[in-house]
Swiss-Prot record:
Biological role stated in the UniProt entry: APOE is an apolipoprotein, a protein associating with lipid particles, that mainly functions in lipoprotein-mediated lipid transport between organs via the plasma and interstitial fluids. APOE is a core component of plasma lipoproteins and is involved in their production, conversion and clearance. Apolipoproteins are amphipathic molecules that interact both with lipids of the lipoprotein particle core and the aqueous environment of the plasma.
Residue spans of the Sequence repeats: 76-97, 98-119, 120-141, 142-163, 164-185, 186-207, 208-229, 230-251
Protein name (record): Apolipoprotein E
Sorted UniProt keywords: Chylomicron, Endosome, Extracellular matrix, Glycoprotein, HDL, Heparin-binding, Lipid transport, Lipid-binding, Oxidation, Phosphoprotein, Repeat, Secreted, Signal, Transport, VLDL
Chain spans, region 8 X 22 AA approximate tandem repeats: 76-251
This protein's record includes keyword Transport: yes
SUPFAM superfamilies per the UniProt record, alphabetical: Apolipoprotein A-I
Residues reported in the UniProt entry to bind heparin: L158, R159, K160, R161, G225, A226, R227, I228, R229, G230, R231, L232
Residue positions, PTM Phosphoserine: S143
Species for this entry: Onychomys torridus
UniProt-annotated stretches for the region Homooligomerization: 262-316
Endpoints of the signal sequence: 1-18
GO process annotations (BP): acylglycerol homeostasis; cholesterol efflux; cholesterol metabolic process; lipoprotein metabolic process; melanosome organization; phospholipid efflux
Family, per entry: Belongs to the apolipoprotein A1/A4/E family.
Length: 316
């Protein structure tokens, strides 16, 4: 029980610090800074720009959110991004050339995982907007301010996750591209080796034997390092996501507490008004009865004056 209270206190302090010093947003307001002109990056940039417009929650956005227009636009942009991404990945696979099978499989697996995370982020965004539309439709004639605030918080969180996963995918594709370039260079080296003189071929074969002995170790070391880095990044991402969830839950709890307090104040005011309405007529009636009684007493005294008492005189 003490441990639970300690965790709650730490969470509250973290929320207070977050309110006192707001977290700085990454510089992503104009364009994605890491874009290098690849078609899939340009398609993702269009998705990002549309998301920035949706996040303003302007009157036009609110109007279009009532229909399926926003989710349809996001679906088209998602499909364009995934199509361009698959085409770019296929192009890199064709350029890989000769490469260790373990390295090829590892790179392909990492890129596929990063691609899946990016697609899941886009899908979560679309689903969240669809959920908001359904919630608004069920609250016709009521205030949707709380729904808009909650949507803004979720969009900010999803946008950060989308940015992080997009950068991770770009980095892994860069490694994939470097592997393709290395494979092409190895292919040219192999042709040069076959066309060289016999002495050069023998010397090259000897050098390749030495390199071949160390290559599996190098590949395994690279694979192990990549797995360790991936695991550390995953743990860090999970910790950040968990912290965001805790903060979001605390914000929701605080909003509910404030709402309940406001309702209690309103109920107290209503009860006070009812009490006043009950007792005011009673007090006024008692005052009227008391005034009538006083008037009657005064009238009775005026009509029947008390005669002066006779005092007997003493005999002299």
């Amino acid at each position: 029980m003490k441990a639970l209270w300690a965790v709650l206190v730490v969470t509250l302090l973290a929320g207070c610090l977050a309110e006192g010093e707001p977290e700085l947003e990454p510089e992503v307001t104009d364009r994605l800074a890491w874009q290098s002109g690849q078609p899939w990056e340009l398609a993702l940039g269009r998705f990002w720009d549309y998301l920035r417009w949706v996040q303003t929650l302007s009157d036009q956005v609110q109007e279009e959110l009532q229909s399926s227009q926003v989710t349809q636009e996001l679906t088209v942009l998602m499909e364009d991004t995934m199509t361009e991404l698959k085409a770019y990945k296929k192009e890199l696979e064709e350029q890989l050339g000769p490469m260790a099978e373990e390295t090829r499989a590892r790179l392909a697996k990492e890129v596929q995982a990063a691609q899946s995370r990016l697609g899941a982020d886009m899908e979560d965004l679309r689903n969240r907007l669809g959920q908001y539309r359904n919630e608004v439709q069920t609250m016709l004639g009521q205030s949707t301010e709380e729904l808009r605030a909650r949507l803004s918080t979720h969009l900010r969180k999803l946008r950060k996750r989308l940015m992080r996963d997009a950068e991770d995918l770009q980095k892994r594709l860069a490694v994939y591209k470097a592997g393709a370039r290395e494979g092409a260079e190895r292919g040219v080296g192999a042709i040069r080796e076959r066309l060289g003189p016999l002495v050069e071929q023998g010397r090259q074969r000897t050098a390749n034997l030495g390199a071949g002995a160390g290559k599996p170790l190098q590949d395994r070391a690279q694979a192990l390092g990549a797995r360790i880095r991936g695991r550390l990044e995953e743990v860090g991402n999970q910790a950040r996501d968990r912290l965001e969830e805790v903060r979001e839950q605390m914000e929701e709890v605080r909003a509910k507490v404030e709402e309940q307090a406001q309702q209690m104040r309103l109920q107290a005011e209503i009860f006070q008004a009812r009490l006043k309405g009950w007792f005011e007529p009673l007090v006024e009636d008692m005052q009227r009865q008391w005034a009538n009684l006083v008037e009657k007493i005064q009238a009775s005294v005026a009509a029947n004056p008390i005669p002066p008492s006779s005092v007997p005189q003493e005999s002299q």
